[in-house]
Design a protein with these regions (language model features):
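Predominantly the C-terminal beta-signal and adjacent terminal strand-loop region
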Residues: 24, 31, 154-202
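Membrane-embedded beta-strand positions of outer-membrane beta-barrel proteins
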Residues: 36-40, 74-78, 116-118, 128-132, ...
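Outer-membrane beta-barrel strand-turn architecture
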Residues: 67-71, 120-126, 162-166, 199-201
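Internal catalytic-core helix/loop-beta-alpha segment
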Residues: 122, 127, 131-141
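Hydrophobic, lipid-facing positions within transmembrane beta-strands of outer-membrane proteins
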Residues: 36, 55-61, 110-116, 134, ...
Length: 202
């Protein structure tokens, strides 16, 4: 089922690329230089894990590479994502934490995602984006938190890019996103808001 969802997500994203290119205005790319972004995010978990790790957050670094004469950019991203327990954690929960006892309030599940994807500007500075890649559990005892120390991860979102700095070459992106690290027992997923501060590299 998760593979079907990922394929559906890819089809939707490719359809958006095709539609955006068909409606492309040649003068649009003048404010889209190569950019390096530094981001922060905050959200809440969804699915079964939300009963144990209710809050989520993270920091990220992203490289945005605009395609010439196109409203599409290629994204490369990495960072640190964490889920914080809100009221205790039962080690017997669906494969998480087997044989290691019980986790208490404030316990943190930590991951490093490495992803690539596309960012599309269908209308002016409004954008949609989607990424996929690998998520690495970096807790000292990864089996306390996951079945898979390394797992597939995907995310998608939409937002608005606010111009900043000289000629608007820098920007601040504000977006709403969904992220999912599917695995047996439910995995880790979240809905959150993200702010990325982008700096033009040329």
């Amino acid at each position: 089922m998760n593979i079907k969802k990922a394929l559906f997500f890819i089809v939707i994203l490719l359809g958006a690329v095709y539609r955006a290119n068909a409606q492309y205005n040649p003068g649009y790319s003048s404010f889209r230089p190569l950019k390096l972004g530094i981001g922060i995010s905050s959200g809440f978990s969804t699915g079964p894990v939300s009963d144990y790790f209710g809050e989520a957050g993270g920091i990220s670094v992203a490289l945005e590479v605009p395609l010439k004469h196109s409203p599409v950019s290629v994204l490369f991203s990495t960072g640190y994502t964490f889920y914080v327990s809100g009221g205790g954690y039962d080690a017997g929960f669906d494969g998480y934490g087997f044989d290691y006892g019980t986790y208490y309030q404030g316990d943190i599940a930590s991951f490093i995602p490495v992803e690539a994807g596309l960012k599309i500007f269908p209308v002016s500075r409004f954008f949609i984006e989607g990424l996929a890649g690998a998520s690495f559990n970096v807790n000292s005892y990864s089996s306390d938190y996951t079945y898979k120390p390394t797992a597939f991860i995907y995310s998608f979102g939409a937002g608005y890019s606010f111009p900043m700095g000289f000629r608007g070459r820098n920007s601040t992106d504000l977006s709403l996103f969904y992220e999912n690290r599917p695995e047996p027992g439910g995995g880790y997923s979240q809905v959150g808001v993200k702010a990325i501060f982008n700096f033009a590299l040329h």
